[in-house]
């Protein structure tokens, strides 16, 4: 009887998981308007063991970014670069509902190219309920200055990926190539596979 119940419960749980995944996929990409409540509940995060002062600086930036997106960019995507070693912060860069191009912003691009390795954090919001994009991963991997990248969703949730001292660009690039091949070109699936293996090549993630 216990085995029967276990099998039934397992099937029920798996069905619930499939339904939840299907709902997430259905809702993915639909813009969520930013509310004051979402801004207030942005959590304190400390990527790569950041101290409290740095974590507070990151939290305040995430809140300011959402407020800027809410009031000045129709809840669309906005990005901002921080220098975690100096406490400097660049102006917000506006995007649209699906993307923001920090490389097209002169000041941001200059930082990406000239700041010391592992000194910069790139923060941006996602209007929909999506995760890191392929372009996010490209920018994160290819610019030595970028140590951490964060997504703060329009509902106030924060995800981060950070390079550790063991970051291996060649291994990470090879891992992404394998993930793309394994996923038959499905970018979302490739990113999921890639990030599941991220600790192998020196990337720390939090969610």
PLM regions: where:
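Contiguous alpha-helical segments
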Residues: 1-31
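Glycine-rich short-loop/terminal segments
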Residues: 28-116, 180-207
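Short, surface-exposed loop and linker segments with low hydrophobicity and enrichment for Pro/Ser/Thr
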Residues: 68-75, 139-147
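Residue-level detector of short, conserved catalytic/binding motifs and their immediate flanks
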Residues: 77-79, 120, 147
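Short, flexible beta-strand-to-coil junctions
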Residues: 82-86, 125-127, 143-144, 151-157
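Short active-site-adjacent helix-start/loop capping segments
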Residues: 89-90, 130-132, 159
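Short HxH-centered metal-ligating active-site micro-motif
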Residues: 95-145
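Divalent-metal-activated hydrolytic enzyme cores
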Residues: 144-207
């Amino acid at each position: 009887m216990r085995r029967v119940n276990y099998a039934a419960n397992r099937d029920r749980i798996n069905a619930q998981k499939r339904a939840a995944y299907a709902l997430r996929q259905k809702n993915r990409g639909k813009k969520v308007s930013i509310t004051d409540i979402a801004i207030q509940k942005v959590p304190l995060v400390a990527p790569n063991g950041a101290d409290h002062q740095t974590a507070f600086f990151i939290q305040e930036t995430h809140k300011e970014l959402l407020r800027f997106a809410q009031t000045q960019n129709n809840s669309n995507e906005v990005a901002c670069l921080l220098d975690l070693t100096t406490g400097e912060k660049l102006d917000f860069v506006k995007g649209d509902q699906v993307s923001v191009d920090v490389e097209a912003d002169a000041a941001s691009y200059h930082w990406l190219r000239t700041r010391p390795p592992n000194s910069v954090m790139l923060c941006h919001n996602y209007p929909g309920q999506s995760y890191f994009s392929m372009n996010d991963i490209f920018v994160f991997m290819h610019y030595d200055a970028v140590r951490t990248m964060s997504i703060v969703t329009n509902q106030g949730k924060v995800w981060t990926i950070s390079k550790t001292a063991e970051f291996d660009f060649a291994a990470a690039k090879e891992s992404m190539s394998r993930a793309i091949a394994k996923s038959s070109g499905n970018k979302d699936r490739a990113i999921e596979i890639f990030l599941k293996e991220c600790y192998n090549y020196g990337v720390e993630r939090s969610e």
